């Protein structure tokens, strides 16, 4: 478990061999109204269960309510989770190193106005948090501590490989819509999301098989637990595209990276040949991820 980033910058390319999660507390308190989180989908379920166990640090007279209870709206994910940006200190660990990462913070409806000014100090941060700075910092520490304990307490890592199924399917819907737009005014032979969908199907099958295996695993069996943990940890790292150079395109993550190899790039381009190549490479990246999650590559039977 890692909480500091500066001493680790020289190890980013091999950090997935040294750590299994990165939790960032940079800028953890800049307001008091909302909780916002940027994270790998592997950590979504863990965060939700953790927030149900941590009391709201401010309370507003409602003693006993958890942070989860205080989230406004019915849709927890929509209210709390937001895309991870490049300026987030957790971003390179996710998009460059392929480590499940999470950034957690208390914010206000308006952005914190004092960054980079002489007013960026404890006094004005107190104003921004309505003098609840200590309580909010304590709450943030409790969330981070609970996350760490839940990750290391059990013999099997609490990474939810199922959650990526939903995320990947959402991307397929967007890409299919894009392909319809591109092919509307002419034929584009071979330009189809068929194989991409098959690769996502392979991932879904691998995730379901792992869940079944978890139900039948003796958690006192160290070797079995190690094997399962190793397969879960391969998911994030294998979503780093192997078809671009880390030197030229450092943020190689298929979903969270930047460059022509990403899912997002497929929604922007007009060149059909380039799009066909992007689809093929994305398919192979996802299939490789599915194969890694499945375990022994010699036991895998697929046609891609």
Where are these regions (language model features)?
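Secretory-pathway/membrane protein signature
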Residues: 1-304
């Amino acid at each position: 478990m890692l909480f500091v980033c500066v001493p680790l910058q020289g190890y980013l390319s091999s950090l997935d061999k040294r750590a299994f999660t990165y939790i960032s507390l940079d800028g953890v308190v800049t307001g008091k109204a909302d909780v916002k989180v940027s994270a790998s989908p592997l950590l979504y379920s863990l965060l939700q269960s953790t927030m149900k166990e941590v009391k709201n640090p401010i309370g507003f007279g409602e003693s006993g309510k958890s942070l989860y209870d205080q989230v406004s709206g019915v849709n927890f994910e929509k209210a709390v989770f937001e895309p991870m940006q490049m300026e987030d200190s957790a971003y390179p660990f996710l998009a460059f190193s392929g480590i499940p990462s999470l950034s957690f913070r208390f914010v206000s409806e308006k952005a914190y106005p004092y960054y980079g000014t002489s007013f960026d100090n404890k006094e004005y941060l107190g104003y921004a948090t309505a003098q609840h700075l200590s309580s909010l910092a304590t709450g943030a520490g409790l969330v981070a501590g609970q996350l760490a304990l839940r990750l290391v307490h059990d013999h099997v890592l609490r990474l939810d490989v199922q959650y990526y199924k939903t995320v990947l399917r959402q991307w397929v819907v967007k890409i299919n819509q894009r392909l319809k737009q591109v092919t509307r005014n002419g034929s584009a032979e071979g330009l189809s999301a068929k194989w991409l969908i098959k690769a996502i199907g392979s991932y879904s099958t691998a995730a379901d098989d792992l869940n079944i295996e978890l139900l039948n695993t003796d958690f006192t069996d160290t070797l079995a637990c190690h094997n399962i943990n190793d397969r879960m940890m391969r998911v994030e790292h294998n979503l780093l595209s192997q078809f671009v150079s880390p030197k030229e395109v450092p943020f190689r993550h298929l979903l969270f990276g930047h460059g022509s190899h990403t899912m997002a790039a497929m929604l922007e381009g007009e060149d059909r040949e380039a799009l066909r190549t992007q689809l093929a490479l994305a398919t192979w990246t996802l299939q490789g991820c599915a194969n890694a999650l499945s375990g022994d590559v010699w036991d895998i039977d697929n046609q891609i």
